Amino acid sequence: MTEIINVTAREILDSRGNPTVEVEVAVGTGDVGRAAVPSGASTGEHEALELRDGDKGRYLGKGVRKAVANVIDEIAPAVVGLDASDQASLDARMIALDGTPTKSKLGANAILGVSLAAAKAAATAHGLPLYRYVGGAGARTLPVPLMNILNGGAHADSNVDIQEFMVVPLGLPTFAEALRCGAEIFHALKKVLKGKGAATGVGDEGGYAPSLASNEEALAVIMEAIGQAGYEPGKQVALALDCAASEFYDKKAGKYELEGEGKRFDGKGLVEYYAELAAKYPIVSIEDGCDEDDWATWKLLTERLGAKLQLVGDDLFVTNVTRLSRGIEQGVANSILVKVNQIGSLTETLEAVRMAHRAGYTSVMSHRSGETEDTTIADLAVACDCGQIKTGSASRTDRIAKYNQLLRIEEELGGAGRYAGRSAFEALR
């Protein structure tokens, strides 16, 4: 019934105007699954390889014709005839066909496109929504949105070093109310920034990208916006940071340079800097607080703040069970950011989430800075019982599409659904 009968691919554009891969998989029932692959701006060194053409005369070298050709000429002949419902076997076939640790032969963008499209085709053939097909009967938890309303770092042209400042509406009763809360704070922040004469253009993920004096000023204006929107900081709305520290780490000197503030820290100094921010503001989560290979400082950070805050490994773990296993063994971080294109297949993504949950780590389903209208991660957040999702601000359709899909899922679940709310973070207390 769900035998794969055809696989095709094409080059489309993502939210930054860069090419990406879109794949369609058809199964014997006549159902077709379509998936578009996201792309990151700040990427971890240990991520699976996103195959680009490198032809500078076309899309500045970022074309994906090679990856598209690999889907059509290499992957399709190997998977036609396989059962799309057997996700593990399908993904294993593609991984073996590639034969490299980072999927550099065929491209993680090629493999992932087929992996996700096949899951969608199988779900449709079985008459199930994707979240139910992947997550089973128990998939009913709507995630807390970590809404990136102010951008810095690699996501914006400004002097703010921390990459993302997020509002976390954890004290609301439903996902719909949490989303409304985040949107109202987003609009209030625009007024606050305008009042200060700051720019209100948005960055890659839909958050404002003003030029502010310091990271702390960014936190202060968000706190003001929360109040102006009529919400209570700490009780109804918390804050989260994605520091993307690998972007401001000087590997040779072993120092962290916050150029926008004129500050330079060793590992211990950086940890104390975060501790001071957490003591002053209602921060519940810090992502990538240290460089992806600075395990010693990660350990210091976890020992200092791990009992109080969610410490999320993104570039640190890259959705990879080998790196996550090392983190668990060493007691580093207490949460994993989940990005399907970091590892390059649905099966491996699910394995990483399961490993994290078994170890008592939380998980945060995440978009990339280069997105499309594809809403797969919204379904996966519910399917994997992540309890949290990062998919940008309350602007840009590529971000809103995921939130709208979660609204549909919440409506479909009705009384059986539950909003994770504060419970998504309570395991850390």
Curated annotation (Swiss-Prot):
Molecular functions (GO terms): magnesium ion binding; phosphopyruvate hydratase activity
GO cellular component, one term: cell surface
Catalytic activity: (2R)-2-phosphoglycerate = phosphoenolpyruvate + H2O
Pathway this chain belongs to: Carbohydrate degradation; glycolysis; pyruvate from D-glyceraldehyde 3-phosphate: step 4/5
Pfam families: Enolase_C, Enolase_N
Active site per UniProt: 205, 339
Cell compartment(s), UniProt: Cytoplasm; Secreted; Cell surface
Keyword Secreted: yes
Major localisation: cytoplasm
Cofactor note: Binds a second Mg(2+) ion via substrate during catalysis.
Record's keyword annotation contains Ribonucleoprotein: no
Keywords (A to Z) from UniProt: Cytoplasm, Glycolysis, Lyase, Magnesium, Metal-binding, Secreted
EC number: 4.2.1.11
Binding positions (Mg(2+)): 242, 287, 314
Known role: Catalyzes the reversible conversion of 2-phosphoglycerate (2-PG) into phosphoenolpyruvate (PEP). It is essential for the degradation of carbohydrates via glycolysis.
UniProt xrefs under PANTHER family: ENOLASE (PTHR11902:SF1)
Family membership noted in the UniProt record: Belongs to the enolase family.
Stated name of the protein: Enolase
Organism: Anaeromyxobacter sp. (strain K)
